Amino acid sequence: MPRTADTLAEISGPIESIAGALAGKTIFVTGATGFLGTALVERLLRSVPDCQVAVLIRPTRRSGAADRAKREIVRNDCFNRLRSELGDSFDSVIESRLSAVGGDVSTDGLGLDDEGQRILASADVVVHSAAAVAFDAPIDSAVEVNLLGPSRVGAAITACSARRETDHPDKAPTHLVTVSTAYLAGTHMGHATEILATDAMRSGARARTHTTVTTEVDITAEVDSARNIRSELESESRTPTRLTRFTKKARNELGAAGTHLLAERAEKLRQDWVRASLVEAGRARAQALGWPDAYAFTKALGERLLVTNHPELPITVVRPSIIESALAEPHPGWIRGFRMAEPIIISYARGLLKEFPGIPEGVTDVVPVDLVAAAIIAAAAAGPSASSTRVLHVASGVRNPFRYGHLVELVQAWFTEHPIYDSDGQPIMVPDWSFPGRGRVQRQLSRANTALGFAERLLSALPIRGDRAELAARVEERRSLAERALSYVQLYGAYTETEALFTVDRLIELWERLSEADREVFCFDPAVIDWDDYVENVHLPSVVEHARVRMTSARPAMEARHDRALRAILSPDRHLAAFDLENTIVASNVVESYAWLATRHLPLGERATIIARILREAPSLLALDRRDRGDFLRSFYRRYEGAPEELVRRDAEELFHHLLLRRSFPAAVARVRKHKALGHRTVLITGALDFVVEPMRPLFDEVICAKLATDSNGRLTGRLERLPPTGEARALVLAEYASSEGLDLGQSIAYADSASDLPLLECVGFPVAVNPEAKLAAIARKRGWHTEEWEPASTGSRSVLPLGPLDSGLSRWWERLDMSQKTDSPRKISGTSPGNRQVLGRKAR
């Protein structure tokens, strides 16, 4: 039979010394790389000097358990105090007392090898703190870790019991201390007692009596359902309809970035959709049964399954409320990762959360992490109850209530005195909250998301650059933040509206059993917390430090960051600097170069015809360019068919001096020369034609461009002899060049202006977005890439299309031909009508 609830009298004996009770013991800890687990391991090693600690860590393909323990636990700043106290002996002490065991709580048998089983068999106490702690964890992973994990740990202990009896015949059975959550009480109101749901169900008590969810659930069916949902969603995500949507969205985000990048983004969108659907499925199932989300739901069922499946084990259940930064140990404010409150606080301080649901008179039940770690250690030292599974709440709401309204007042006052600064260097004024219902806040944020999403789509579709593109990037960032704020309301709103009060009778009984000395070292009484001091002087300073928000005027910081990035880019240590041409070196493009060359020797009347034809085709040209830059260039360059190569090359010299030089960016030219002066190899990589860029060749060490073939009569065929390097081809060509020259792309720079240049920018260590269009501006802002805004040499007005000098006395080689009369016609541009023909060349007169 499972153990039943114990009485307070059963645990009334004094504990002379926690360190003494655990001396010589081996304590096996799961979840040691997490927030609570790291604090627990550090506290054991520092405050229980004669115990051994073993940690279960899942190996990765790159790192074994020992490497992860060293990197993710021992090197964490949580250990700074112990490192300072031990000095030079720190490494040897850690090596002698801390061991890492490879394994995984989501695997039956924990994935232990023989050595791992030996260590588990020797453990006197197992603290199971591993959990999928995110409130938005996918239902299948929450089931594997939170629901099945505790029972798997119990099964592994039982499986090792025979070995323990053989190897350690004088030792008592292993004591399992499992960390659950107080919020498995669900959405009930009133006092939630330290009782197992199975005991409440067995006694016939109603849910409202114990303020816990006592709904009977078929746990096996829930596990099967979660696994099946994953399988079903994975299958649906691969249907043609879904894949088309993901691909379309990827193209909208990245434009003509290239097949591989678009495929990667579409696959990421598919995976995100599966995950979001799993989260929603978990939330819906949990709320249908009385829990706010999959976290509380799976933790509750995991606790039930453990005590039902393993009645033979001595078990203590520790249920913390919301765990936050340390009150004092190892140092005030220590935190690892953001918990529940931090994202809400930072979003509020940024002015993003104008409202948040909650009951101002309600209790915000949070507890510092060091109090939880101390309570777990004390529970381990006290040992298990002789006849029952002991349950301990580690919560503050009853013992030392902290009202939600007061928390908001403290946060508002603190950020009024210490505001966060926005990107313009202006302090952000925090709003007043009126504590509306969750539904109202969600509707407000949903409307804001819709409006910002529309603005983002509109701006990204416009051909804007520079400051206007930066505006689009800011809108995208704002939309992303608003989307995140909505998710916070959906995730955490239920917790700020919780009216359950978690009693701590057994916790305080345990506290009263401690000696005065242990109460100093292992403090876990919530009554010691001064909430005003904790929020103002401990928690909020820690939150802003870890959030890395701007707490001073932003402009000097931004200027300093810009200068640091520029110094890194212009370091002599760099190897290569690659430059795009259009809107990076010159404010021009292949269409303008063609228009200038095509009209160079045309009389006035024919000029109007050719320009009108190009403008008429502009929408289809733009659509093709956005879809595939390579297809656009191949199609557009067919217009050069029949042109005399010698004449075009001669005219291209004029093009450079009359147009390109005027539209060049002096800062770009200076930057190329600066790189050359620093000894960097300079490369121009462009889809423009060789005769257009030929005058620029002296500026660069290498020019990689497109080239048209020539027939036996010296005329351009309109077909490419050397393909234009676009999309992924740019990255591949540059990588080949760097490899052949012994250059490291990780120590190289790339300058480009468009999202279609992403492969080029991503293949180097120092990407620079120059005069970026809207999509690239948003990407660069998100990734923290260096950005340059360069002005052209001539700032005068620009014509729609530039025209070559009027010279009707020389040869004219352009005319309109009927496509139907040509046997080898170039591919027609998508979207053009039969009468909208390409302008092609003919023999010179």
Model-derived regions: residue spans:
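N-terminal Rossmann/SDR dinucleotide-binding element
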Residues: 1-125, 129-132, 139-143, 148-151, ...
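Active-site neighborhood of HAD-like aspartate-dependent phosphohydrolases
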Residues: 569-624
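Glycine-rich "substrate-gating" loop/helix at the edge of Rossmann-like oxidoreductase active sites
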Residues: 290-294, 325-338, 358-370, 398-400
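Non-catalytic pre-domain segments flanking phosphatase-related domains
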Residues: 537-581, 816, 820, 844-845
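Alpha-helical substrate-binding/gating segment
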Residues: 307-309, 342-357, 364-421
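C-terminal cap/substrate-recognition subdomain and adjoining C-terminal extension
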Residues: 563-568, 572-574, 650-651, 657-845
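Conserved beta-loop-beta element that borders a ligand/cofactor-binding pocket
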Residues: 233-280, 284-294, 298-333, 385-392
